[in-house]
Amino acid sequence: MNVSSDVDFISVGCNCLGDCLVWGQNKLAAYGAQNFIALFDPIQSKVLATLPGHKDRVNHICWVPNINEEYKNRYSSYENELLSCSSDNTIISWKQIKGGLNYQYKVVEVLKGHSDSVTNISVLDFPDGSLLMCSTSADNTVKLWRRESLTKENIDTDTLPKWECIQTIDFTPKCMECSSLAFIPGTTIPLLAVGGLEPKIHIYIQNLDSTTATLQFKKLMSLQGHQDWIRSLSFKTINEGEGEGEEEELILASSSQDFKIRLWKISKFTAEKQKQQQLDESGNGGANLLGSLSTQLSGVTSLSTKGYLFNCNSVKYIILLDAVLSGHDDWVYSIHWSPARRDQETGKKIQEQMLISASMDKTAIVWRPDRTTGIWIDESRVGDMGGNILGQYGAVFSPCSQYILSHGYNGAFHFWKQNTNQKSSFWEPQIVVSGHFGPVQDLMWSPDYSYFISCSTDRTLRLFSEWKRNNNNNNLENNKEQQIISWNEIARPQIHGYDLECFTFINKKTHVIVSGAEEKIMRAFVGSQNFVDTLLNISKVQPVNDGTQRPLAANQPSLGLSNKPYFTGGSDYNENIDNNNNNNNNNGNGEENTEDSIKMKMGGGDEGGGGEGMDTGYFEDEIPFNPEVLSEPPFEEHLLQSSLWPEIHKFYGHGNEIVAVACSADGMYLASTCRASSADQATVRIWNVSNWKECANLKGHTLTVVNLSFSHNSKYLLGVSRDRMWTLWERSASNSEEPFVKVISAPKSHGRIIWSGSWSHDDKFFATGARDKLVKVWNLDNIKDIKNACASTLPAFGSGVTCVEFAPKSSKFTGEHGDHLLAVGEDDGKITIWKSTTSTSNPKSLDWTCVHTISPLISHTLDVRRIRWRDTPTINGNSLTYQIVTCSVDHSVRIFNIKFD
């Protein structure tokens, strides 16, 4: 049997850090996602690959320009190297795999030298092909690294020279967090700018006494003017090759927490400039410039009027404040110039003076000097004028400067395309990738397997579905339309105020879920009518007429945690109030039927007990909004505000935070657990779905029950716990007062906490996986004879087992018991597929063989929390392909295709 796998879909948000995103000339964008790098194509709106290597959060990424012509031809790319830095104190050099796809990279070198988190890196390429890199760190140092140019041996063997640390600059007690490198205009002498937790920008220049091979830098000056910490620095050379007699000038853009952007111009100090500005040289290389302007602006303390002079190779240069850009209302985290590009017709290098800044005021601004006056103006402003987002952390231009890509506080991306078809150009929002920005704890396919929902400690439930549309390409043969299918987030059923831990679908009901978080109550939600219609438009999922009357949409009040149902003007909710009020204003118990009392009967708010009807919550009226039925995946703003599911019930009873929840296959019972440190707390509560009431409280454990699993026939309930044992309960007769009775507990069935349990498709076996690196498979027929109940123990794994999941039934795998497939996830991100055969020595036992291990290049990097098989595999001739969806503490959700030949 030949088994292979590939990744079909990756969803992960960007790290919540400033400037953690880059877009290269090779058309690939790279961003930090937990402890790995994600490479994606913004135009296709798809994450192509992830690069594992770091042990902690990735803080900054930088593409390395490829100036070697042979390498350019070999890789057909301007960039085929990448540098990244992390909170694990290291810098990693990445290189594109020879002969691989343009998004397949490997680790070339791990640079160690810093003693604390590395916060920023910048790189400069010399004409001879050598490289200079600057790294800043929380250890209060800045390190300079050098790499020699490629040799013939490097090119022949497809290797790279080693990086060497050539200088360490100590800034104790200050910490530098950003840097930028450039050449002094008209020379190949490097200039370094660093900034950090102080209002100064420190400028360093190469010590001309040092050799080219042992570059050493000396401090030139400190630029003053900002009133708060420096957040981002970026150099740009202008006037390069633009007409005869034009002198090169260098502009340094700096952004700060003082809400301002400053542009510093570095150019040769000519006699003409001296005559025009009448510079009066005075100490520290400074000069009192623009005296008249200073007098006029005496009340503006943030405008520096000082010019800075320095000598380089007997040539005098001056640094002048060129402009102060004021347009943001909060910290400016990121500043980037538009990239240089080649004119397709003339081949000339075009470097537009265009700048983009990203701020915590939720906007990104495109700045450009006015063509007539030369004054810098905010040409365009993109972002969110309201809503729930908390600001932009970074923004970059595409290689052609026709697109803007930004990332925000909640890990979300925002993508705009410039539309120049109109008289005045404007930026249109585009569909872009999305994902969690915190550990993903749970996920599950919908009962019909048309979509899945993931649950994260970033306090959101996210719903992903296939976007099915036709490719209207006129070049297709016979003009037949080809269907394109991609996975996208189309709804966000819950945005909570607590970290979400678990959820489950209610089987036999359409679009109904129950979630649990770090609070003592659970909440039930129903898909809105807008969601049902949107799912039909985007995924072609036909609605099921189950008699459920759905609210049009949901809205979350400003100070509430409940998703309030939203109806049209003539809703049943309003009619219910009117009918009850008209019924003699009496409820039959001598109490007046006021509007308030009816609202409380329909569910109440967060303060009271849950009723049996629709839980509207009693809050002040919200600002009206217009829910939309969409025909394509929504933007982040819509997901945040208009894709919530209405809350229909709250479950009260648990004394601590909810940990696990599960629903029986027949949809009759719901089981839930909470954090526990004693037997009284470690109970499993059973709820009757028909009336949402608690009907049993099952005992059997002494510590937290971390996972619950019903058998496919709904007859058994399996619980696994921190107390290192599992417990099995059996469904009672329908006329019994107790719906479930305990069958057996297995003390010390594992040596460490048991994280997961799963039933085989025929319910004859169940598997348990634990931190003791073992997976055990138990035979239900022998379950009461605990000594002989273990049908098999898989070989010890390399790390703790965090989840196990049996595959659904397939005709391809048959045997006396029906051969089984089992997926196992570990706490290092590894996923393996195992196949069973009936043991020849014991018919009631199973022998297991590992048939496939998903490649680390596409797999997770941290704990795998859930693995879910899609119900129906795809059969093509003799091959069979399953889909599994997985989630991890590494913030990512992935879909893998597992192909059996």
From Swiss-Prot:
GO terms for biological process: regulation of transcription by RNA polymerase II; tRNA wobble uridine modification. It holds the Pfam family WD40. Pathway: tRNA modification; 5-methoxycarbonylmethyl-2-thiouridine-tRNA biosynthesis. Residues 571-598 are annotated as: Disordered. InterPro entries: Elp2 (IPR037289), WD40/YVTN_repeat-like_dom_sf (IPR015943), WD40_repeat_dom_sf (IPR036322), WD40_rpt (IPR001680). Keywords: Cytoplasm, Nucleus, Repeat, tRNA processing, WD repeat. Residues 574-591 have a biased composition (Low complexity). It comes from the Eukaryota. It is found in: Cytoplasm; Nucleus. One of its GO terms (cellular component) is cytoplasm. WD repeats lie at residues 11-50, 53-104, 113-155, 173-214, 225-274, 327-377, 387-426, 435-474, 495-535, 653-697, 700-739, 749-788, 796-844, 859-897. Component of the elongator complex. PANTHER family: ELONGATOR COMPLEX PROTEIN 2 (PTHR44111:SF1). Belongs to the WD repeat ELP2 family. Component of the elongator complex which is required for multiple tRNA modifications, including mcm5U (5-methoxycarbonylmethyl uridine), mcm5s2U (5-methoxycarbonylmethyl-2-thiouridine), and ncm5U (5-carbamoylmethyl uridine). The elongator complex catalyzes formation of carboxymethyluridine in the wobble base at position 34 in tRNAs. Folds into a two seven-bladed beta-propeller structure which is required for elongator complex assembly. This is Elongator complex protein 2. It comes from Dictyostelium discoideum (Social amoeba).
